[in-house]
Amino acid sequence: MQNFDEIIKKFPKKRPDLEEKYKLIFDEWRLLNRNAVGTANTLAAILESWCHKEIAKDKFKGNILEIGAGTLNHVKYEKNFNTYDIIEPFEKAYKNSKYLNKINNIFTNYSEITNKYKKIISIYTFEHMTNLPYEISEIKKILDKNGSLHIAIPCEGEFAFKMGWKFTTAIAFKFKYKLDYSVIMKHEHVNTFEEILILLRNYFKKVEVKRNPFILPIKNCSFYAYIKCS
């Protein structure tokens, strides 16, 4: 296992460049993926719903901030919030969402935020962040002293997760675009489960981890994980 000092030296990371043929289909693929269009994406969304439900179990009456809210597909799971704000720079992802009317403020970066939040959410976003230590530091600034950070991440870097996308999404991607899905994964998922967890344990006093029970809730046998930090 890596230690914190080894991991922190890797940041900021540089995302691998995509060849032009991948760039041409990238936005289309991202929207299809986020909207769970197609059998493989639908199956992934069903498995991912476990994390949405786990995050929503933490009920309270207060203000929520979601980082990387995408298509706003988590909003329907939260029932008791006063206001729901988001950080999402990709406007195409949410502009046609039926949950848009439930959103109070839409931010593109942390500098626009003046509030503190009791509950901050980030779902399948931390694996994409090229400067994750900076992101975590900014999150701590806007997290209420009695608040908590709730994140969901894939078990990137582990056997089950890799086999999962290789035999579902990768096949569908190859069939549709005649391209190698592993190129997209290397471009998109720049952080592993292990790296994310070690960073979080350095920045927060209490870090609770719960793995998806499918296939088994242990290393190399689970696809996704829910992490609560306070």
Per-segment meaning from a language model:
Residues 50-161, 225-230:
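Conserved SAM-binding loop
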Residues 4, 9, 16, 27, ...:
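Short linear sequence elements within intrinsically disordered, low-complexity coil regions
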Residues 4, 15, 19-22, 43-45, ...:
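Short linear sequence motifs
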Residues 6-21, 32-34, 38-42, 130-141, ...:
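S-adenosyl-L-methionine-dependent methyltransferase catalytic module, highlighting the catalytic core
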Residues 23-56:
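Class I SAM-dependent methyltransferase Rossmann-like catalytic core
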